[in-house]
């Protein structure tokens, strides 16, 4: 009997645990380890940040749901991974031995890159976790009591730009509903992207035109090619550069309320494993999600290293979105199962297809990129009220999946396949490893 450990219980790790247990059955043991004892649906955090959703709407305790599927659950943070001995040391000092390890930890938020940008230090908030989103809402309520300048956007090195656009548009929409939009003296969007709608992936469809128009309609002044150097005394210090990376403007923006997506790094326990990660702490994997150094370690989601799609004047990263992450998870599960069944030569690849819904207040933006990284076979970006409704429905659907203990229900698989969207490169399912 082999012991497979999933490290991390987010939108990658929790589906991975369910899918792994379903694939391996009772003949092998599956353990899920998470620093949190609850699951949170991170894509809904922008709503929490303005009070449109509460914590209990998007988060729930993990243990009951995974243990009834025969998955062992440990609510402890991993402090160290000994890849040679195949042991994980937990925060309480206990160790867990594994035969196979799948890393799905998500990121460490690199607030230290920009002095004063930590939500606990000043006016700039984060919505990367539900805890941060709740704090952002508390600060937003303070803004409503005493209006002032708003700055929202993404830091240099950020890779998850969608939520920045979402939150900016949602805040603008909420202010209008409250009759307070005209009380905000300035509303600024600051991004490290070379142009609006780049999204870290050279844009999708007409994302540039649609998002530029959306920000303009809301009266939000946008600046691209920007890096925030520090936040101090309710001021944000920003440097804007040209196409060659040369400084063209230094700005000091007043900020009563802000939200900036930080750059990501790998979590310390993972980043500290010799030869496992790149300098940023992200796991170096091959096209089958397997570590390039350790054959029994796999990784999926934000935890893996994906090079930027292009060199930009201000550093930007490539995002790892929901369906793309599920694609990675499915490939890793297939390959671990093949190993355990003595079929180590058979390798499966994920498609890395991306389907994303972003709420923009009373409207929304959706994109389908097959695959997410260019060159693409499908490249569509759409905008309208239907996307807002679709995201509301998807949140409820995904949370229900996680409570039911199913990674990919058959009807989801059939429906997506009819649309030409699959998790795995089926033609490579039995591809022989070179």
Curated annotation (Swiss-Prot):
Annotated membrane topology: Peripheral membrane protein
Keywords tagged on the record: FAD, Flavoprotein, Membrane, Nucleotide-binding, Oxidoreductase, Quinone
Active site location: 160, 356
Gene Ontology CC: membrane
Outcome when changing residue 132 to A: No effect on FAD reduction. Reduced activity with decylubiquinone
Annotated protein name in UniProt: Sulfide-quinone reductase
GO biological processes: aerobic electron transport chain
Cofactor remark from the record: Binds 1 FAD per subunit.
Cofactor (UniProt): FAD
Subcellular location: Membrane
Quaternary structure (record): Homodimer.
Entry similarity comment: Belongs to the SQRD family.
Predominant place of localization: membrane
EC number: 1.8.5.4
Annotated Pfam families: Pyr_redox_2
Functional description taken from the UniProt entry: Catalyzes the oxidation of hydrogen sulfide, with the help of a quinone. Consecutive reaction cycles lead to the accumulation of a polysulfide product on the active site Cys residues; these products are released when they exceed a critical length, typically as cyclooctasulfur.
């Amino acid at each position: 009997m082999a012991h497979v450990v999933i490290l991390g219980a987010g939108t990658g790790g929790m589906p991975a645990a369910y899918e792994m247990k379903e694939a391996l059955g009772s003949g092998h043991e599956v353990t899920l380890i998470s620093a949190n004892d609850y699951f949170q649906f991170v894509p809904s955090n922008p709503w929490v940040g303005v009070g449109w959703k509460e914590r209990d709407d998007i988060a729930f305790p993990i243990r009951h749901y995974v243990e009834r599927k025969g998955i062992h659950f440990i609510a402890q943070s991993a402090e160290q991974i000994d890849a040679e001995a195949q042991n994980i040391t937990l925060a309480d000092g206990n160790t867990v031995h594994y035969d196979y390890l799948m890393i799905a930890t998500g990121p460490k938020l690199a607030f230290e890159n920009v002095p004063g940008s930590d939500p606990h230090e000043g006016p700039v908030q984060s919505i990367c976790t539900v805890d941060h989103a709740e704090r952002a809402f508390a600060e937003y309520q303070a803004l409503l009591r005493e209006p002032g300048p708003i700055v929202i956007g993404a830091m240099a090195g950020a890779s998850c730009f969608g939520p920045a656009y979402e939150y900016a548009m949602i805040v603008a929409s909420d202010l209008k509903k409250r009759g307070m939009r005209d009380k905000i003296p300035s509303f600024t969007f600051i991004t490290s992207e070379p142009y609006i709608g780049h999204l870290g992936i050279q844009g999708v469809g007409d994302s540039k035109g649609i998002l530029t128009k959306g920000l303009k309609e809301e009266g939000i002044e946008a600046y691209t090619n920007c890096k925030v150097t520090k936040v101090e005394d309710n001021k944000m210090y920003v440097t804007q550069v040209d196409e060659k990376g040369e400084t063209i403007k230094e700005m000091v923006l007043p900020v009563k309320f802000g939200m900036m997506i930080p750059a990501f790094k790998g979590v310390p326990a993972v980043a500290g494993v010799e030869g496992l990660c790149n300098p940023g702490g992200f796991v170096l994997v091959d096209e089958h999600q397997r570590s390039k150094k350790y054959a029994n370690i796999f990784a999926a989601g934000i935890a893996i290293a994906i090079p930027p799609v292009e060199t930009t004047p201000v550093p930007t990263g490539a995002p790892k979105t929901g369906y793309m992450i599920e694609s990675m998870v499915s490939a890793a599960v297939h390959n671990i199962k093949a190993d355990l069944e003595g079929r180590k030569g058979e390798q499966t690849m994920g498609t890395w297809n991306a389907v994303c819904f972003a709420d923009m207040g009373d409207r929304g933006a959706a994109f389908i990129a097959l695959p997410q990284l260019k060159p693409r076979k499908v490249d569509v970006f759409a905008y309208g009220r239907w996307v807002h409704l679709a995201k509301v429905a998807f949140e409820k659907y995904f949370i229900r999946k996680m409570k039911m203990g199913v990674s990919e229900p058959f009807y989801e698989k059939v429906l997506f396949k009819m649309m030409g969207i699959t998790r795995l490169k089926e033609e490579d399912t039995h591809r022989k490893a070179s």
